[in-house]
Each structure stands twice: as C-alpha cells, then as structure tokens.
Regions:
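Membrane-interface loop-to-helix entry segments
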Residues: 16-30, 134, 171-215, 225-272, ...
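Transmembrane helix-loop junctions in multi-pass membrane proteins
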Residues: 2, 69-70, 82, 141-163, ...
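Loop-to-transmembrane helix boundary motifs in multi-pass membrane proteins
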Residues: 125-140, 334-340, 385-387, 416-452
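Flexible loop linkers connecting adjacent transmembrane helices
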Residues: 23-49, 72-75, 85, 89, ...
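Membrane-interface "cap" regions at the ends of multi-pass membrane proteins
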Residues: 16-70, 256, 292, 296
Length: 575
C-alpha cells in the first residue's frame, strides 16, 4: 500500500476528531473564555506565567513528543502495520487526547493544581501520597533513559576509544543543542522585556535556529558519552529550577519549528517518492520477540496513542501557563492528535525503509527514522552532512524536550510528596526536602544513579508504568467530573481498557522475571557458576519495581473506586 495514502487517511481522521470530538468534549465539560486562569491569578514569574496559546501548545507538543511515538510505533510494527495504525488512531482520539485534555482541564479548573493535588482533593491524602511516589519513581526511570539516549546521540567515541564514523555529525549536533540552550535564554529575555508576540517571536525563533546550526556546523564539540552525560544533567538541573519563561518555554518554541520541519520533510518525502509500505499488514497475534498482541501492542506503542506522562505535563506545567480557557482544546487535545500523526509518519518511514520482503531496516527505531527522513532531505537537494546533523539534532531534541519537562515534574512530585499545608512555617528536614534546588538535586541524583547501575534493567517496565499512570489519571478524572456535575461517561471505556492492559502487562512481566531467576538458578547454582548473580540483579530489580508498581496501582484504584462510590454531585463544588 502507498504510504502517502496511509498518512492522508490518518491526518483526515485526526483532524476530524479534533474538530468534532474535541469540540464536543469542550462543550460537554464547559469552557469559559472570560474566566481568569491560574496563570493570571497566581502569576509568580517562575511556574505560573501567562503565555500566548500557541506558545503553550508548542511547549505541550515538544514536551510530550519525545522518544515514544517514534520508537513505540516502529517496535510494535512487528505485529504488522495495520494493528499499529488502528491503535494509534483509536487510542489517540478516544484515549490519549481525552486523558491529556481532561488532565489539563481539571488542573486549570483547580488553580493549576498538579495531578497529585487533584487526587488529594477528590480521592484523599493517602491516594495522593501513593500517586506522588509512583510519579517520582516513574520520572527517575524516564530521566535515566532519556539522558543516556541524549549522551549516546552526541557521543563521538566508540568502545575502543577511537572516533566513530559519525563523530563530526554527532559533535555538530551537540554544539547545535548547546547553542539552542544559549539562544533560548536570550529569546526568553527578549520576550520578557520587549514583549515579542506573533510573527515577531516566530521570526526570532527561526533566526536563532539558523544561527545555532551555523555555529554547530563550523564548531563541532568532540566529546565522549560520559562528558555529554554530565552536560545533560547540568542542563536539566537549570531547566527544572529556572522560570519557565527564561529557558523551557523559549526552547520549546524553537524546538517546535524543528519538529514541524522534520514532519513536513517526512510528509513531502512521502508525497514526492510515495514509497510502498513494505512492512507486512499483519503478522499474527503472537510475536516471538515481543509476546502476545494483548497487551504488548498497546504497551509498546505507548505515547503515540496514550501516555500517562502527558497528563503530568498537562497538569504540572501547561495548566500554569494557559492564559485563556479557550486555548485548552488545542493545547490538550490538539497536541496529542498531532503526536499521533507523528507516530503514523514514523511507521510509514520505517515501512518505506524496509526491504521488499518486509524485513525491517537495521538499527534502532530512532536510527531507522533518522536515516529515512535524512534521505528525503538529500533527495530535495540538501547537503548530506547538513541533513544528518539536522536529523541527529531532531532525534536528540525529541528526548531533551521530554527530559527537561520530566525533570521539572519529578522535582514538583518530590516537593509535593513531603509538603504540608503550612509550608511557610515548616522547619528542619521537611523544609530542606521541599527546597526547589535540593529536591531537584535529589531527583536528578536518583536518575543519574540509575544510568550508572543499569537503567536498562528496569526500562522494560516503562511502557507498563506509563500506561498505568494514564489509567490512574482517568480514574481521577472520573471522580472529578462526577463531583463537579459534569459528564464522565466518555472516561469509562478508556479507563477499563487501560486497567486491563496495564495490570495484565505487569503481571506477565512479573511472571517472566520470576521464571528467568528460577531457571538461571536451577542451571547455574548446581554447576557452581557465578552468572546467576548477574541474572538476579538484572531481573530482581525489575521484579521489585513491578511488585511496587502493582501494589501502588491497586491501592490508588481502590481509593479511586471508594471515592467515586461515595462521591455525590455538589453544585458548590463545580469550578
């Protein structure tokens, strides 16, 4: 099948869903353009910052469009491209966009409270503590993985200490990324003091992007993975503590232009070349490497269809910058359906890169996607080196924009975990743990530790934890909508399905890890071998976290069900 046809069908479905279902949700729940948002009421120059709607959209999209939509869609294609396409469209429209929009809506209607604080208000303090602990652990895993991914992308040296073939490309992309950070601060200061909006801020963004690439192409930084890892963690520390307007928002605004260029380049490549989808339509309900289609397909696709992490961005940062409630639809629902389109494009690029017999191209999903789009740019007459640097930068930016967002969210989750109502008079250890800089340091230290002891051992749990997080958010939205007298029937189908998917995946993972440990012990211990210890560490860590996630998830679901059962519509509670 022609990949262009697939992309066009997806684009029509997603745009139609935004115009019809998204607007229906907005009308059903109630949008008040005249209401003062938390960004206006609680403006503090750090987290609560009134911001133009499209700038908030850029922040939301660039924060949620991380590694997931590309990696997940391509990996899940092992079951065939049709199941992936169907789940991305159905999941994005009725699951992911509803969750993101709902989380943003609930937060804005509650003074910009994060999801943890919303759970305390509508479910209880115990549920809040459990949820915040779950979120903090989840953020640590994401920080470790994405930081390692970024450092590996810019790495110029191989395992033998020699320069790799792509050293100049990687070094140039690294320098471009650093210049992005520098120009983002300059951009933020210009916006703050000169109040640039509309076409003026867009022109400035493009100028700074061009300057970043000019500097990067001429002055590449050749460093190893360890050095880039330190640089990455230093950057995300500042991104987590500095005011949103100074670094995070302007960088997201600039990055969005790159994402748009990447997506447009991929689409134009599909239009001009209209390559055939070489991946098989359907390979069966079981895959030798991944397992059974249910629940693995849903967990693997992850962010391209639905993601709990998105709700943390919606309620943790975006809700504190929305200036007008009418912007919530495009920020919450619109950013998610655009990410679903990115997942479809990634699937089609991988399909175009596959061999005629359906064999997937060599390399990681990111490498497959990067090479595919870079080849389109070269076909348009762009220089090979520039195309490679641009796509390497895009790949790293996908991870970096999610990384700095999750670092801030992890810091906030940690602070909320130990905070009390009267923090102004808090003393001792509680005041220290809730300090912005100290809580950020501990959060990043946890993520950094995971990169050193082997985050890869627990990364397989990311998909399940991410989807479970979305189910917990949906459960909270059910209670919120009921208490405030709003319709919540559209929440039940995705909630029930995601609970079934995530707990099944976690139990399957738990059983697999127990078998791996016991089988290794049965073979190696009698033979006097010492390799069992390594197997136990790798799988034991996953086992502990899987049990912890299941216990936390079940407890939160129990408290949510109890709160929903006891909740009554209170006309005074409507916000």
């Amino acid at each position: 099948m022609n990949t262009l046809v697939i992309v066009l069908i997806a684009a029509v479905c997603l745009f139609g869903a935004y115009m019809l279902y998204g607007r229906w949700l907005a009308n059903k729940w109630g949008i008040d353009p005249s209401a003062k948002t938390p960004a206006v009421v609680h403006e503090d120059g750090r987290d609560y910052v009134p911001t133009d709607g499209w700038t908030v959209f850029a922040h939301q999209f660039s924060s949620i469009a991380g590694a997931g939509p590309v990696t997940g869609a391509i990996q899940a294609a092992a079951f065939g491209w049709l199941p992936v396409l169907l789940w991305v469209l159905l999941g994005g429209i009725f699951f992911g966009a509803v969750t993101d929009f709902g989380a943003l809506y609930a937060s804005v209607k509650n003074d910009g409270k994060s999801m943890g604080m919303l759970i305390e208000k509508y479910i209880g303090k115990t549920g809040r503590k459990l949820f915040l602990l779950f979120c903090w652990l989840f953020c640590g895993i994401v920080i470790a993985a994405f930081a390692d991914m970024v450092a590996g992308t810019f790495n110029a040296y191989g395992a033998d200490g020699a320069l790799v073939e792509a050293a100049q490309t990687n070094g140039a992309a690294g320098m471009v990324s650093i210049m992005f950070m520098v120009f983002a601060v300059v951009f933020g200061l210009l916006q703050k003091n000169l109040h640039f909006t509309g076409w003026k801020e867009n022109v400035i963004s493009i100028v700074f992007i061009v300057l970043s690439f000019v500097v990067g192409a001429n002055f590449p930084i050749i460093l190893g993975k360890a050095a880039w890892s330190y640089i990455t963690f230093v950057y995300i520390f500042f991104a987590a503590v500095l005011p949103m307007w100074l670094l995070k928002q302007p960088r997201d605004h600039m990055t969005t232009f790159m994402f748009v260029a990447m997506i447009v380049g991929a689409v134009l490549g599909l239009i001009v070349n209209h390559p055939v989808m070489n991946l098989p339509v359907f390979t069966g309900f079981t895959n030798a490497k991944l397992g059974t289609m249910f629940p693995i397909l849903f967990v693997t696709v992850a962010c391209g269809a639905v993601s709990g992490f998105h709700s943390l961005v919606s309620s943790g940062t975006s809700s504190k910058t929305v200036t007008n409630e009418k912007d919530m639809l495009k920020v919450g629902y619109g950013a998610m359906v655009l990410e679903s389109l990115l997942a479809v494009i990634a699937l089609c690029v991988a399909g175009a890169s596959a061999a005629a017999d359906g064999t997937t191209a060599d390399g990681t999903p990111f490498q497959i996607f990067s090479r595919g789009v870079a080849s389109f740019f070269v076909g348009f007459g762009l220089d090979q080196h520039f195309a490679s640097v641009f796509m390497t930068m895009c790949v790293s930016a996908l991870a970096l924009t999610s990384l700095d967002a999750v670092a801030r969210i992890g810091r906030m989750s940690f602070q909320e975990l130990f905070s009390v109502d009267d923090m102004e008079h808090a003393e001792g250890w509680r005041k220290l743990l809730c300090n912005v800089y100290f809580s950020t340091f501990l959060t990043l230290a946890f993520g950094f530790l995971l990169t050193k002891i082997g985050y890869a051992n627990i990364w397989p749990l990311f998909g399940s934890a991410n989807q479970l997080l979305s189910a917990l958010v949906l459960a909270t939205l059910c209670v919120f909508l009921k208490v405030t007298g709003r319709s919540n029937k559209m929440i039940f189908p995705p909630l029930i399905i995601m609970l079934c998917v995530t707990f099944t995946a976690l139990v399957q993972r738990l059983i697999a890890m127990v078998k791996a440990i016991s089988n290794a012990a049965a073979v190696t211990i009698p033979a006097g071998e010492t390799t069992w210890g390594a197997v136990f560490i790798a799988n034991g860590l996953q086992l502990i976290l899987a049990v912890l996630l299941i216990v936390l998830g079940l407890n939160i679901v129990f408290h949510s069900f109890k709160a929903y059962k006891n909740a009554e519509h209170n006309s005074e509670a409507k916000v």
